[in-house]
């Protein structure tokens, strides 16, 4: 079976990851001891994508949990599903990374990385046909960003032909955790551009807005935010875990979404999102889901798709519905909003349908879009980065761990190049493209 190996790193990654496993266990009928207590054969049909079957009918998550301090892991272990993970798969240090990317990537993290890789290898050897890795981490701190990207590049070396999917929480514009977030995030993006295949971009502020405006929660907690993320993660992978009429896997997803290798940062959305009180006043229909899914307010990162154009997009529907209706609705969106899609990639929206809806809903949909407007986010981080870097503020924390200023300059220009690439394709039209080709041919001839 096509297994996926899940890795979570740092405080944020471990908290998102824990929530993800709660959702997945619930969907597959696995209780908190790892025993199956479900009611449908479909739950077990492809359970080995995410679980290993151990002796005595226990299902153990294919998960590796890492952190540079023990705190988050201890609370995870004592949480509702803490006993389900393999104890050897918890890998942690004692020192912490102190929100310093260099500590995570070069010093503290580098000391721990080999023991993490040993666990990853052990888990990979347990798979029949490993499809790829999914990594949960944040880019603002030290461990998830520094050590997370270190692990991603090491895995890249060892498993070059496997897919690498990340769920990356970007620093948000207004809600800041640490003052050095722009440094950590820029250094991480520099790595993710080169070493990851697909990045699902999340950000706390957008998630706060969804909780506040749409779900009408007065004081959203990180638990609420993580619940939104886990719903999306479950939606992205449901085609791999349940039978469906139009299935996709990590590689199909990449082939359909990534027109140029560096542009692999996606916006994600989820529908239906309604406040608890107004749930019963809305019908769940394919048109409803489609409309809400494409809504800018539903995007889980602080970039507005209306400020750019979609290169590609993919929609995953769950529940009993007609594929014909799904196709009609998706076509409808494209026809009505054709100016928001680049015209030089025809049929750039793909949909897939999985028969099993999430717990408590009759149908749902998950949206993944490759939009040029995501450059707004990189631009924002880059401006904050430049403001501090120009004055060399806080730099001694990084150079003290052996980093070179040159590395900062490279990361900065790589991020700016990425923004420029998005802008270039946002402005490109079908006619221009043909001219480019002629020029290139002439050069070759010359």
UniProtKB/Swiss-Prot annotation:
Binding site for GTP: 11, 69, 138, 142-144, 204, 226
Source organism superkingdom: Eukaryota
Stretches of the chain forming a coiled coil according to its record: none
A GO biological process held by the record: microtubule-based process
Summary of subunit composition and partner proteins: Dimer of alpha and beta chains. A typical microtubule is a hollow water-filled tube with an outer diameter of 25 nm and an inner diameter of 15 nM. Alpha-beta heterodimers associate head-to-tail to form protofilaments running lengthwise along the microtubule wall with the beta-tubulin subunit facing the microtubule plus end conferring a structural polarity. Microtubules usually have 13 protofilaments but different protofilament numbers can be found in some organisms and specialized cells.
CDD domains (UniProt xref): beta_tubulin (cd02187)
Single GO MF annotation: metal ion binding
Residue span of region Disordered: 423-446
Requisite cofactors: Mg(2+)
PANTHER family the record matches: TUBULIN (PTHR11588)
Family under the similarity heading: Belongs to the tubulin family.
SUPFAM superfamilies on file: Tubulin C-terminal domain-like (SSF55307), Tubulin nucleotide-binding domain-like (SSF52490)
Gene transcribed to yield this protein: TUBB3
Chief location of this protein within or outside the cell: cytoplasm
Compartments where found: Cytoplasm, Cytoskeleton
Ligand binding (Mg(2+)): 69
Keyword Cytoplasm: yes
Name this protein carries in UniProt: Tubulin beta-3 chain
One Gene Ontology CC term in the entry: cytoplasm
Listed Pfam families: Tubulin, Tubulin_C
Keyword Transcription listed: no
């Amino acid at each position: 079976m096509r297994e996926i190996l899940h890795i979570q790193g740092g405080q944020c990654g471990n908290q998102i990851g824990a929530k993800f496993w709660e959702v997945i266990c619930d969907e597959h009928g696995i209780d908190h001891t790892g025993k199956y207590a479900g009611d449908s054969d479909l739950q077990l049909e492809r359970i080995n994508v995410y679980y290993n079957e151990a002796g005595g009918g226990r299902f153990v998550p294919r998960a590796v949990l890492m952190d540079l301090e023990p705190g988050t892991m201890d609370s995870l272990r004592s949480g509702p599903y803490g006993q389900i993970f393999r104890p050897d798969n918890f890998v942690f240090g004692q020192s912490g990374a102190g929100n310093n990317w260099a500590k995570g990537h070069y010093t503290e993290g580098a000391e721990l990385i080999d023991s993490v890789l040993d666990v990853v290898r052990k888990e990979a050897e347990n798979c029949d046909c490993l499809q790829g890795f999914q990594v949960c981490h944040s880019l603002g701190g030290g461990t998830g960003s520094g050590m997370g990207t270190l692990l991603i590049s090491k895995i890249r070396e060892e498993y070059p032909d496997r897919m690498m999917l990340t769920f990356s929480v970007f620093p948000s514009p207004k809600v800041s955790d640490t003052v050095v977030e722009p440094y950590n995030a820029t250094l991480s993006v520099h790595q993710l551009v080169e070493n990851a295949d697909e990045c699902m971009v999340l950000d706390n502020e957008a998630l706060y807005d969804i909780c506040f405006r749409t779900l009408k929660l007065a004081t959203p907690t990180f638990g609420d935010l993580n619940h939104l993320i886990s719903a999306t993660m479950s939606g992205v992978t449901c085609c791999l875990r349940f039978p469906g009429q139009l299935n996709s896997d990590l590689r199909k997803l990449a082939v359909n979404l990534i027109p140029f290798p560096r542009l692999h940062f996606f916006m994600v959305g989820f529908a239906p999102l309604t406040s608890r009180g107004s749930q019963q006043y809305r019908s769940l229909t394919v048109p409803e889901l489609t409309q809400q899914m494409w809504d800018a307010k539903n995007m889980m990162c602080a970039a507005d798709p209306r400020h750019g154009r979609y290169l590609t997009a993919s929609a995953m529907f769950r529940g009993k519905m007609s594929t014909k209706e799904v196709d009609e609705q998706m076509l409808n969106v494209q026809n009505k909003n054709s100016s928001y899609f680049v015209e030089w990639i025809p049929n750039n929206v793909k949909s897939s349908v999985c028969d099993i809806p999430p717990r408590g809903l009759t149908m749902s949909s998950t949206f993944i879009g490759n939009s040029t407007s995501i450059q707004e986010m990189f631009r924002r981080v880059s401006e904050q980065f430049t403001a501090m870097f120009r004055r060399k503020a806080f730099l001694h924390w990084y150079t003290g761990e052996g980093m070179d200023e040159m590395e900062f300059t490279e990361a900065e220009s790589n991020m700016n190049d990425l923004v420029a690439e998005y802008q270039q394709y946002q402005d490109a039209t079908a006619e221009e493209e043909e001219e480019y080709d002629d020029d290139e041919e002439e050069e070759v001839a010359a």
